[in-house]
A protein has these predicted regions:
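A detector for short, charged/polar N-terminal pre-domain segments
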Residues: 1-7, 75-77
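Short basic helix-loop element that most often maps to the first helix and adjoining turn
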Residues: 10-29, 54
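Conserved hydrophobic/aromatic packing and binding residues within compact polymer-binding modules
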Residues: 12, 26-27, 37-40, 66
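Recognition helix of helix-turn-helix/homeodomain-like DNA-binding domains
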Residues: 31-47
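DNA major-groove recognition helix of helix-turn-helix/homeodomain DNA-binding modules
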Residues: 50-65
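Short, charged recognition helix plus adjacent turn
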Residues: 57, 67-80
Length: 80
């Protein structure tokens, strides 16, 4: 079972790809470096709860889209 961070990373990568954006495009929208986006998408950088609103705005998706595939227990632990 993948952990929540891996699920969010996969969903961020999928949303970016769906828009045909390069990592640099998402980085510019977030005010992040390309390396931060790459590390986030590859699970090398944990996505903090504070990052979620910015990711949702940049990708123009609701939080539920980034959490799609998460286990109920993970969401309960986050109090979502």
């Amino acid at each position: 079972m993948p952990d929540l961070a891996a699920i969010v990373a996969r969903n961020v990568r999928a949303e970016r790809a769906r828009r045909s954006w390069r990592q640099v495009d998402l980085a510019e929208k977030l005010g992040w470096s390309i390396g931060m986006v790459s590390e986030t998408e590859n699970g090398k950088r944990r996505i903090g709860i504070a990052d979620m609103p910015n990711l949702c705005r940049a990708l123009d998706v609701p939080l539920t889209d980034l959490l799609q595939g998460a286990e109920r227990e993970d969401l309960i632990a986050l109090k979502l």
